[in-house]
Amino acid sequence: MKDLVKFLKAQSKTSEDFDVIKIGLASPDMIRSWSFGEVKKPETINYRTFKPERDGLFCARIFGPVKDYECLCGKYKRLKHRGVICEKCGVEVTQTKVRRERMGHIELASPVAHIWFLKSLPSRIGLLLDMPLRDIERVLYFEMYIVTEPGMTDLERGQLLTEEQYLDAEDRWQDEFEAKMGAEAIQDLLKGMDLEAECEKLREELQETNSETKRKKITKRLKLLEAFVQSGNKPEWMVMTVLPVLPPDLRPLVPLDGGRFATSDLNDLYRRVINRNNRLKRLLDLIAPDIIVRNEKRMLQESVDALLDNGRRGRAITGSNRRPLKSLADMIKGKQGRFRQNLLGKRVDYSGRSVITVGPYLHLHQCGLPKKMALELFRPFIYAKLESRGYATTIKAAKKMVEREEAIVWDILAEVIREHPILLNRAPTLHRLGIQAFEPILIEGKAIQLHPLVCAAFNADFDGDQMAVHVPLTLEAQLEARALMMSTNNVLSPANGDPIIVPSQDVVLGLYYMTREKVNGKGEGMLLQDPREAEKAYRTGEAELHSRVKVRITEYVKNEAGEFDAKTTLTDTTIGRAILWMIAPKGMPYSLFNQTLGKKAISKLINEAYRRLGLKEAVMFADQIMYTGFAYAARSGSSVGIDDMEIPAKKYEIISAAEEEVAEIQEQFQSGLVTAGERYNKVIDIWAAANERVAKAMMENLSQEEVINREGNPEKQASFNSIFMMADSGARGSAAQIRQLAGMRGLMARPDGSIIETPITANFREGLNVLQYFISTHGARKGLADTALKTANSGYLTRRLVDVAQDLVIVEDDCGTHEGLVMTPLIEGGDEKVPLRELVLGRVAAEDILKPGAEEVLIPRNTLLDEKLCDVLDANSVDSVKVRSVVTCDTDFGVCAKCYGRDLARGHLINQGEAVGVIAAQSIGEPGTQLTMRTFHIGGAASAAAKESSVQVKNTGTVHLMNAKFVTNDESKLVLTSRNTELTITDAFGRTKEHYKVPYGAVLSKGDGQEVTAGETIANWDPHTMPVVSEVSGFVKFVDIIDGLTVTRQTDELTGLSSIVVQDVGERATAGKDLRPTIKLVDANGNDIFLPETDVLAQYFLPGKAIVSLDDGAAVKVGEPLARIPQESVGTKDITGGLPRVADLFEARKPKEPAILAEISGIVSFGKETKGKRRLLITPAEGETYEEMIPKWRQLNVFEGEMVQRGDVISDGAETPHDILRLRGVRAVTEYIVNEVQDVYRLQGVKINDKHIEVIVRQMLRKAVITKAYDSEFLEGEQVEVARVKIVNRQREAEGKPPVEFERELLGITKASLATESFISAASFQETTRVLTEAAVAGKRDELRGLKENVIVGRLIPAGTGFAYHQNRHKHRLVDDVVAKLSEEDEAAIADEFVMTADDASANLAEMLNMADDAE
């Protein structure tokens, strides 16, 4: 019986039987054991008989029969001879499919180095032998000898000898020593290595050495050697003596008509290897001259190289049509390789595609499926039904019936389709809502009908888009489709938790029109008893839709018991709103309907319905809203006519005023008062302002009309202009587009982003002249080209994000950490950009939240903050909350539900098994295509806002200055001399209300701690130039300011005023390159002045382009500008906007000129300067002084004697996330990346929850560098997963040993993906060759933890519905381990009990087979 079970188990060789995949080097014996025979001839197929040649590349004796159960000569045919080996042709009688799995081998006449281990950097063979790659190649390709056995000579092992040196040595020492060429030599060297001894030696060296580079090199080698020792791989296996041959069906040869063959490139490559190998064997037998043999060996090496990785070394071997042949390496890498083409994405059966059209009559869970398609897709189901009903006796008969499309077939199709969901998918599938399930409704025609409300999720429109249909076959699949993927279960967007089923376009316009008010409409002032009567009045023509009336409205409010209480009030409303109220579900307040509904308000309606009444009601409500919207949009009769674009009368005076201003600036420029750059900036500012004014005038004109009310007096009301209504409701178009239709087109951008200073004053209604048209095409075309390129970039970003985050899954409920992030509202300028509520909604509190000013606990820790609790926070005006975050989660592999918080798409705490990593990646990647390459473009129109130049406060409160340094000028105002000063206004309770960044050189009228009133202007500055502010009073002394060398003097002909302009270093003559133009301040006697309370000279270096309007010796007072530096013009500012910025952040790239941060806290001083750098010293209270060399042109924010904190900015620039992590820790870097990424998305109006970005940050931070290893398994300086270190530290703590010390490291997403523990995942991402080489040498094991690895080996993923399956497998594995530990005797005892008869056995077998079926 036991053997029987074993036999059955052996039969079911499924993918279930392994839990880990190991990759390693194959030894020659291993390759021979895989092989079914040696391939000796290069022949493939006999061209006449089409039979494979014996011993050739397709030999049937080695690889198996060509036809099922038939030997080659035809002696044995049929199943009864199964397993017989024919004595004539030597072919085993079995199935043909063995030709897909049986391998052969080639015995190489001379060893050959494996190119992957040789050329893949860093070269593994080179690292192992500690030799440079060039030297190894010289030996391998027979240019030099290498000493393999020095014997008693004074040669060294591994020394290279040229031909002459070798001959000399042979003369001197005869056969005392051994030196060889080619792969044999390398093989001998590798064989002779004692790995353990070498490891010991390196460890000692590591202890002794002090140099960093040496240390790195030794660590690298040591790691490789240890990997070899641990994995049991032998170094000499990197040189092959036996070459495996791929099974023939994986490199097919197909006869085409006309006697030609289509062949896989691999066959050519193998043929080449076999030919050269056979020729070499023959030469060796003939004992040919050395030089000929050598040449043949080199050619063999080259041909094997080409087979393994063509083009890796030298020129690629090409086929007949000059195309490089596709080698084994090419078969697995790249988008068309095995991993990405066949393992990660497969084409599936039971699918179809067609064009989509609107189905406005459908319910949200339905879609229209053309009958023809349905018949084809559901074929097997129809056959089964036809047979079981007895309409057809065989499948063949059923097939005929379906082909004839008999009447009964349609009835059965309708029955089969009932409640059988299908999946619709629109490419590109950017997030999980790109595939949703619907119930099909059979329709005539050939187009799929789609519900309009799901278009937003699919990003579909009906201009010819196509969609694919898939049929879930098994019961489980249907269940998943219905429970998880049904469109009605995907009302909320996983990216931000807002409804994604929101009406747009027609529906919005219809509802907006319906809920508008009109002064003095027909029937105004009527009293109506209920909405039904209102509808009656409208239908009979007694009242207009927009008339203001009084209606009795009955609202239903949920009471404590969960039942509805009715409440009726007489409400001032309009007919339309009363009619709309009829579709409102019970439990909604009328106030939400009693307003003019725009797109935002409608979205809020659906959101409220979902939150108050649950999913079902919300979905039904959304459907009703859609039907109503369509109906009333049709009744509104809105259309666009040319007269709707009303041009404001003021337009022409505004434009002529602007033209006058421009002319004035031009005069100033000609008279030398302003520089060219300043003139350009000011002109652009003037036109931008003019454009704004025209737009304002136009909107005022469009948006209001004057009417006579019932009393006969004129009154203003919102206009019923069609274009205005479309934009105002949010249905289509925007103010910016109407501006171009009826205002002026405004400033246009050139393709490089700079702005053309002559605007287009015409609009589309007036029409453009030729020049204006030409200017506008210039920028607009760039937009189109950008869009095409952008899509690819966006897709690639998504791919990298998914790859880095794919194995992050919710694995437990609570990790128990008290850590978290502190959330505060984001305030920019005078307004709250993001309120606290939005930041904490759906998060879990990390600590008890206390009532401000009291010790009372409002909300205990570990509570999920939902809408109600957020109301509590608002009511108590809490302004900072510490919430749990995935970045601080303590779970080892995965995250816990409490740290993640709410599942945004479902509205409750997230379930275990949810793949949060993939969701995060999709949420960030999906809007990627909307992020423009350059920041703003509206049809190429540039919107250069007039730059800010002052701070005007909006709230009364107290001024607070952060990081501020200033001097007081003689008007007793403050002049800032610090660079990142932040100014905040706080109210009486100390809550921040406004937040501004104030630049260097700004003049403040109020200081720290002073009161201000709303509307007061407290700071102003020149937006176009940056001053150099004098911090002491004194007299100007020029240093290195030499006319013609470092500066040019510009004198104005008209005014006679002269100014000095400093030249850029690049423009100067050689003599002036090293000079540093500086303004020094001296006292009346010419002595140096020091800055107050320091010993730093009052001297100011002038950067290039700075303009000095003072003369040598002029007197200056404190706070006066010494020089001004023109700021870069608008539009050409080098802000990487949009997608590239997001990519840079996630790749953790270092900016060009990064900010310099203080490495330690202490007092700043300056040491001895070198030619181009200054030496900055920071002296801490105790410990070593830190010093850093800083280039002189960097402007410093610190002065001598100043106290800095670790992580403070010393010199401005873009901050590097790596520095932030090192100096300020994990939380700071998380905050930095989240805020920076959010800035980009907010600018485009895209809402993404912070959680998703944090998930990616967690994955970027998952590696650590060991700083102190003690006696653990790690090496110092080694990069390890943080989770691994934590696990080891827990064990060490239990044993009472000191914990391993480590520093967190931030990796860019690409690097992090490649550094993952799973080699399968990394190999299928990028750089396949390098990853596989590294993994094989180290003998890596893949635990199949992530999603990708499991997809590749064809299993359910360990997330979602596959999560439980994997947990069960894990349990079974533990049970099996326990069972295996039962002693052998028990097993023998058990076996005795199993004495049974044949009948018993067969009965038992039947039972077992049934059980197996059930299990499946």
UniProtKB/Swiss-Prot annotation:
SMART domains named in the record: RPOLA_N (SM00663)
Record keywords: DNA-directed RNA polymerase, Magnesium, Metal-binding, Nucleotidyltransferase, Transcription, Transferase, Zinc
Claim: Transcription is one of the keywords in the record: yes
Annotated Zn(2+) 1 binding sites: 71, 73, 86, 89
Disulfide cysteine pairs (residue numbers): none
This protein's GO CC annotations: DNA-directed RNA polymerase complex
Keyword Ligase: no
Cofactor binding comment, as recorded: Binds 1 Mg(2+) ion per subunit. Binds 2 Zn(2+) ions per subunit.
Residues where Mg(2+) binds: 461, 463, 465
Co-factor(s): Mg(2+); Zn(2+)
Family under the similarity heading: Belongs to the RNA polymerase beta' chain family.
Assembly description: The RNAP catalytic core consists of 2 alpha, 1 beta, 1 beta' and 1 omega subunit. When a sigma factor is associated with the core the holoenzyme is formed, which can initiate transcription.
Name the UniProt record assigns to this protein: DNA-directed RNA polymerase subunit beta'
Gene assigned in the entry: rpoC
